[in-house]
Amino acid sequence: MNKELTAMIFDIQSYSVHDGPGCRTNVFFVGCPLQCRWCANPESWKLKKHLMFADRTCKWDQGCKACIDACPHGSITFDADGRPSVNWVICNECETIECVNSCAAGSLKQCVRILTVDDLMKILKRDFSNWGAEGGVTFSGGEPLLQHEYLDEVLQRCHQLQMQTAIETSGYARQDVFLKIFRNIDFAFIDVKNMDDELHKWGTGVSNE
């Protein structure tokens, strides 16, 4: 029996008018082989769960310290003003994230969702009627090609349902992966970082050769 495909997704934006023609649903994948100095979504680099802290809803001023008590690593403490301070170096390596379940205010959340292909298709089918003639779905990230087996299955299902597909990618993947995915892509934004190899390594951390 084949294992059901899943992907790590850190955001899904419905009713977007960016990243492709018309009204769109943008799906942001976790994980990227590049680490661009100018990246707008550095929280998406690592292919793992991530923690998000919303200070504005935190009940620290009402004496709550549930997350501090729950954290087994001591990575959440009070600063000099009595506000919770998160040690992101430790938290970004945490696999269990006990603090999330302890937070009654919902100020601590996992900003990564584990979705099956059926899960994502259910969302896209829900949004489909709002896209209009020019709209569709855009796969972004992170780098969507990093989770290519899942993406390939989703793209095939999208085309079976006559959904227009787009991708935002650096193109940083094996040739066979690139060609496989682009069989079912209608519109592509390919972000070439720099043609000079040394500048590419300086800006992204990897060679372009």
Label each residue range with its predicted role:
Residues 26-39, 51-75, 83-106, 112, ...:
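Cysteine-centered iron-sulfur cluster-binding motifs in ferredoxin-type domains/subunits
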Residues 105-112, 198-204:
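Acidic/glycine-enriched edge-of-secondary-structure segments
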Residues 12, 42, 88-89, 111, ...:
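Fold-independent oxyanion-binding glycine-rich loops
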Residues 49, 81-82, 94, 111, ...:
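Residues at secondary-structure transition points
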Residues 75-84, 99, 108-119, 123-134:
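Fe-S ferredoxin-like electron-transfer domains
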Residues 118-209:
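Conserved AdoMet/S-adenosylmethionine-binding subsite of the radical SAM
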Residues 1, 7-9, 52, 114, ...:
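Radical SAM enzyme [4Fe-4S]-AdoMet core and its adjacent flexible, acidic
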Residues 2-42, 46-50:
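N-terminal cysteine/histidine-rich coordination modules
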